[in-house]
Amino acid sequence: MKTRFTAPLFGAAIALLSVAVTTQTATAATATKIIFPKGSYCASYSGNFSKSKTYSLYLLKNQDFEVKAANMEDGIHIRDARGVLRGQWIDDNTYRIHTRTKGLHYVTVRSPYGDQQVEFCAY
């Protein structure tokens, strides 16, 4: 017995796929690449974070990546190379992810307090 996709289900699957690709492409287009100074594991960025800012970084499997910033109140989100939100708060100012896959990771930072300094560290 053959199984067939019905047109509505197939159309819905295509629509979901196109939304996912569009969202990831939009994120990639607006992301600022994190660049570490030579010989350093950390890079700092400062500015007004009252609107979300997205950063990108290529990480290898089994790396620890930390984002440090004061008063973020859950304003840090990290998407792994597969687009899955990962990470946890390890103290009041530090959000950490242990990478499961290699690839481009995206960090979104937003603060209700506006001006901030954010530090990114990869080990």
PLM region descriptions:
Residues F49-P112:
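Acidic, Ser/Thr/Pro-rich low-complexity intrinsically disordered segments
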Residues Q24-Q63:
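Non-catalytic extracellular/lumenal accessory regions of secreted precursors
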Residues K2-A13:
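Bacterial N-terminal signal peptides that target proteins for export
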Residues L16-T25:
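C-terminal segment of classical bacterial N-terminal signal peptides
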Residues Y55, P112-Y123:
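Edge beta-strands of jelly-roll/beta-sandwich modules across compartments, strongly enriched
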